[in-house]
């Protein structure tokens, strides 16, 4: 009987997560005057523009530090470059967890990298707030230590389809997308929403990454005559697609893009307002980038990073950093990793003042932001919209 009991005890110990084995784990990366936070992002490579999200988040850390920190502790960012590459991302995560022994992780661009990191981070048990990457697979199925602080692909995909159908008399919807998981994370929930409303896409087209001509796809669209097009494409391919739409006389058809594109950047890429005048994008914020509600955040980033050129990506991770600080403040000075996880699960309807939708995390659901606004050009000015013709 003793042998059986001992065997069960050994099995239970082996099956328990690493963070339950060692009390010292609870305060690893924590001192009396600092909280170390591992910040991973593509600080180099072709996707380095996404790292602006990490810069905005770290500017917020510095703001909090200048105000005295959280219960006397400064937020200390330990940066690691993923270059938007899964292998480099895995190496970065392992270094931060095992070598640097940070208290928690926050950040991460590039969904493919973040999905690859999930098993390592989940096994480690350390808190991880995903602050830019959108793939649902990062935070679902539920992992107790992983939290999404931005709208996921499914939230954005449904928001895209909802906006499309808010345009009166929209019945014929076409979709063009990349063939990767990132694109599907938008298009699949968009199609689910359309189906719920009794609409099946009239056309589903693929445009691969790196493709420099969309003539074949545009000619098919000309035959289908859609009322609206959903485009799950990266910025470079979006610009090519919009140019070819105009070239073949389809420039009046509105196009709904993802959070992976930026309205102003798309205008810069095309170099022609007529090409983008009917282009709309998911917009996670309460105002235009140069609007009064965003001014204090822009000033904050410029204070700490005066040479930083601001874009849509610059602001996306700040909201989840605010939610983190709020949770840390509520815990008090006696901080542990388990207490932080529990406090994050108590965040309800947290108004960040920057994201268009609040953050709510519960023990059953760690995908905290359930909706998004849309941005488009109205009277040739970028405008945040709740629905077709309805400013935010």
Describe the function of each predicted region:
Residues 22-25, 49-55, 67-140, 207-214, ...:
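Beta-alpha junction/loop-to-helix N-cap segments that form part of ligand/metal-binding clefts
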Residues 303-314, 325-384:
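Segments of small-molecule ligand-sensing domains
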Residues 24-58, 80-87, 109-110, 176-184, ...:
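Extracytoplasmic "Venus flytrap"
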Residues 91, 136-137, 144-249, 288-296:
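Extracellular/periplasmic Venus flytrap/periplasmic-binding protein
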Residues 245-318, 382-392:
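Extracellular/periplasmic periplasmic-binding protein-like sensory domains
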Residues 33-36, 72-76, 99-104, 123-127, ...:
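Loop/turn elements at helix/coil->beta-strand transitions in domains of secreted/extracellular proteins
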Residues 1-36, 66, 391-392:
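Short, low-complexity disordered leader/linker segments with a strong preference
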Residues 96-108, 129-131, 173-177, 225-235, ...:
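Periplasmic-binding protein-like
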